[in-house]
Amino acid sequence: MSNTPLPFRATHDLDIVLCVESLTAEFGKKFWEFIHLGGYQMQEKSDGTRKFYRFRNPSSMAYPDMIELFARKPDVFGEKELQGLTPIPLPDDISSLSAILLNDDYYSMMLANKVTWEGISLLTPEALIVLKAKAWMDLSDRKERGEHVDSKDVKKHRNDVLRLSAMISPDMQMKLPEVVMNEMAVFLHRLTVTRNDLDQLGIRRKPDEIIQLLSGLFGK
């Protein structure tokens, strides 16, 4: 980020993906140790087939205020521990990223576009653009259906796509699964960018340059 023209923007949360291929019973043990040490007073799980877990209100301020997990491999957390969680309906306000990564095509895209920086695995800017674009479409559709969706969240994902575009070179192109590539084509059709939008975000590129850049990135 320090090598890009983007201004620094602090985040309120961290989106962390646990790769199922690397999870072990030992990880599950360490995870529950973390939850118990944090003294999380509210421990919940979804009562449907999609496995969602939420931990809130830790007794120590040194621990995250809330942890949300969408598990593709729930058995790693241990059946005995999971039985003690309070069943809840699948929340409407779950992380859009969590829901997206239940899709095998998006999950494989993520795995193919991760890099290591100082020992930490991160997603490339172009992969983040794909996830942000998908999240923007999903939240926009839910809002149109009358579901409770914060307009600020919808706008944030769209603005993040525009900000991240400043980190993409014109000759960059991704190899995407067909399903993902087709959905990115839909995103481009729905996306509108004005000069005022870019000025507010401090982006110097022209609106048509952004569209062309994203079209080339997605192979469209």
Where are the predicted features?
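Compositionally biased terminal segments of proteins
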Residues: 1-220
